[in-house]
Amino acid sequence: MIFSALSAANTVVLASGEADYTPSLVSFAWIMAAALLAPLVSYMLKNKMPAVALLIIFGMIIGPSMLDLAHEDPGIGMLKELGVGALFLLAGFEIDLATLKSKQAATGFSTWLICMVSCLVGAYFLLNDIPGAIVMAIALTSTALGTITPMLKQDKLIGTKVGDSVMIHGAIGEVAPITAMALLLGTRSTLGTMLILLAFIVIAVGVAVMPRALIVAVPWLKTAFLSGAGSTNQTILRLIILILAILMAVTSVFELDIVLGAFAAGIILNRIIPDEFHKGLENRLDVVCYSMLIPVFFVVSGMSIDWQVIVNNPFKVLGIPALILVTRGLPVFLRENIHHTGSDIETTRERLQVALYAATGLPIIVAVMTIAVGSGIVDEETSSIFVAGGALTVAIFPLLSSLVKGKEENAQSKAKAAESKQEGREGAEQKGAEKK
């Protein structure tokens, strides 16, 4: 009875409101239940399964293909888009532009280019279809920077050599595929797309300089913003959300992926916010974004996975993570081992960690498959297989990276313990010799 009343398909008015919103509200309730349950289950599993992976799994469970408790209607779809924006806003906020001008960034881009060209050639020979080959190459060579950023925070890797390297590979693995999608899969000509991208860059720069220009022109604005920053007005956070909204709207109007606008907003904030305010602002953004918007994105992404497709094509679904690991993770691992990339990573285990995180992909896979299905390049079943495979990379690769890190730490602890034990023995022998 209760489950029937809470079914997303039920259109009975549950409270004094419009009946049209009832399915959205019911779906939202189930989505937030999944969002709350995920970190609790992750804690029960001693954090061996990332909460992000559980959000996707629980989304699939409550979605149309399994329990059919929640659906992605326009209202939920809007929340999902805002979740994507919040996710990449925070990812961009973590990026230091100076690192993108480094040797490591140049090596990261050349590595991605090698991955992309190799996949493109291989897919073309297999499919004998250029649009299909482009779709496969983009899907197999992306990195889910926004998705792995919370995992890096959970594993306390932000600010470390491994974390910095992952952030660089992730930034390139997000922006480069998005640009490739716009140039190679767009309905406009290549020249038209390049002009659109140039126009977006000009607008983004304008948005970046506008706050400071306004403060110079109207000096009292700074005092007004600071006085309302910690009150119910929350002027600073509202300014940030306005910048995010403007750039997401611009990319949507220009028919670009909104990830590009959100990521640009994060980078802009990193530049215009003074360093001494970064930590406090980041904590407040975490509260705003991770309490609702970002979990909604992951749960709704899980809801879009067709369980029946996984059951009918288990080997194909399992093959996608393996293929991504070979086409994206392996080149990153090999470049880190045989070439001085500037990352200063010393151990093989750390390089393996970077490779596993770099091979984690989902948002770009979802985006490129959505475009491909809409254009008739791939069918719904192929899209579901790739999305399910992308979700598996989110569930598996960060977990493997954590295990690799754990083994490394255990090995270091054992080595230190053995060293201390040996020093103790030597000290005892020395004392015994002195007594004699």
Regions found by a protein language model. Name each.
Residues 53-65, 109-121, 168-182, 226-247, ...:
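Small-residue-rich segments of transmembrane alpha-helices in multi-pass membrane proteins
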Residues 126-138, 148-195:
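Membrane-interface helix-loop-helix junctions at boundaries between adjacent transmembrane segments
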Residues 101-158, 299-304, 312-380, 385-408:
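Transmembrane alpha-helices that form the ion-translocation and gating core
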Residues 33-47, 88-102, 146-159, 210-225, ...:
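C-terminal ends of transmembrane helices
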Residues 45-47, 61-103, 220-320:
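Membrane-interface junctions of multi-pass transporters
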